[in-house]
Amino acid sequence: LSSQLDSPDISVVDASWYLPADGRDSKAEFLASRIPGAQFFDIDTVADLDHACPHMLPSEPVFTQSVQALGIGADSRVVVYDGKGLFSAARAWWMFRVFGHDRVQILKGGLPGWIAAGYDTEQGEPTVATSGVGFVAAHQPAWVTDTEGVKAALSSRSHIVVDARSCPRFAGE
């Protein structure tokens, strides 16, 4: 990635998000240290803000507008990372796939790996991204299911269902 940061088709996105118990502020950390040229993908706001549950997928227009505001176009190669190495970047990667953008990758090691490798970071307000051209979200239903879909998969054993929460969260703690 370091040798491709100046490439016009590369869009680097910091999708850091932390659990409340972590006591970390993802936006403040983004402003303090990030991969040069990165834009901040706010998982808290790129969502259906009218839903009772947090972090529900946004509508196609909301995702389109949010992604275009980050300078991401239809032909952009998006590289997503987070401040833990691999935590919330996976959520952003999945959201891009749900909305039809296949040219998305997760940076191995995230920001901690980038820093450990000795690469430069920048701080302060990011350069305002030029609005992305041509990206229009197109929901891909194969990437999402509902309760009935999960029940059917469990009963038919056609899929493996994995709960990726930590053990304490899985146990309701």
Positions of predicted regions on the chain:
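Cytosolic catalytic domains that perform sulfur/thiol-centered chemistry
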Residues: L1-E173
